[in-house]
């Protein structure tokens, strides 16, 4: 499938709705990422006066808030979008591979903390879970990535600090939540078996990515 060149967040939302799955950056499949299909002037650029501009990066919050859709590290530990239509099958398959963590485990404690407090930005959740010492940030991020890959945690929005002129700056922080809290338990329910969900996703990706090998698609599904 030849993807149209995208010039706006609205155009990106329409594409995600149409194809169901879209990694943000390099997916390992040539041409299959939001970064690959945006117009050249929507890509990352360093500004002469310092700083940077990257329209695609700024669209993420608008996309997850307005579609809505799921966003998180779903594709080989890399971030991307999944439409609500395809989320139940994806969730069904992934959770069959990664059952809900035991509450006594570190992942279970992180998930329980988020469920009890409601949405938190990453650093707030990290502090609430006691990952405050030296080297704890990278360890916490590893646990968080596993929970996102297993579809238990998603990004609700992106929060940016503001300068003295009340302008947003920086890369922003992910506001984390559970998909059930965001959209209700029915959003994750699927009537198919995990095997049926996997096959449905595989066949769909074969249609939209005709030049990708089976190995590449299998790796993408996880």
Residue ranges of predicted features:
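Long, low-complexity intrinsically disordered regions
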Residues: 1-222
